[in-house]
Amino acid sequence: MVSKKNTAEISAKDIWENIWSGVSSLLDFFAVLENLGVVNDKLYVSGLLRKVWLCYSCISVIKCVWKLIKLCKVKFKIDQRLDGEGNGLVKDKLINFKKKYNEHIRHITAALLQDLSYLMVLIYPGTRLFKRLSNIITLCRIIV
């Protein structure tokens, strides 16, 4: 059996990914209820759920940025190998890997955009952080 690292597969799901998706769905559900006005502040138990949501969003943004950094490092190495001399067959494989990594970078940038949008909901408008996040979201939209 070939290991995952050797096959250059980067999107395998594990148990933590499933837990992460479940937490995300639960927080999305509460966000929809809040936006509809169904949930009041008493249910939040002094903003506990809002704090959990804020922590989740921050962790998710950091996770997306970390994945982007790793993918961009690999893409940079592929670009270096393509610039060098080599066999035509190897270059074709590298070009295919580059296309795959470009697609993964687009998907992760879209996920980052969604996570930043969650953060925008939790941060008050007019603050410096809100303005910076707005600029980052605009940049992500341009990339996607």
UniProtKB/Swiss-Prot annotation:
One of its GO terms (cellular component) is peroxisomal membrane. One of its GO terms (biological process) is peroxisome organization. It is found in: Peroxisome membrane. Its main location: membrane. The chain crosses the membrane at residues 18-30, 52-73, 109-131. GO terms for molecular function: peroxisome-mitochondrion membrane tether activity. The keyword Transmembrane applies. It is a multi-pass membrane protein. Keywords: Membrane, Peroxisome, Peroxisome biogenesis, Transmembrane, Transmembrane helix. Homooligomer. Interacts with PEX11, PEX25 and PEX27. In concert with the three peroxisome divisional factors, PEX11, PEX25 and PEX27, controls peroxisome morphology and abundance under conditions of peroxisome proliferation. Maintains mature peroxisomes in actively dividing cells. This is Peroxisomal membrane protein PEX34. It comes from Saccharomyces cerevisiae (strain ATCC 204508 / S288c).
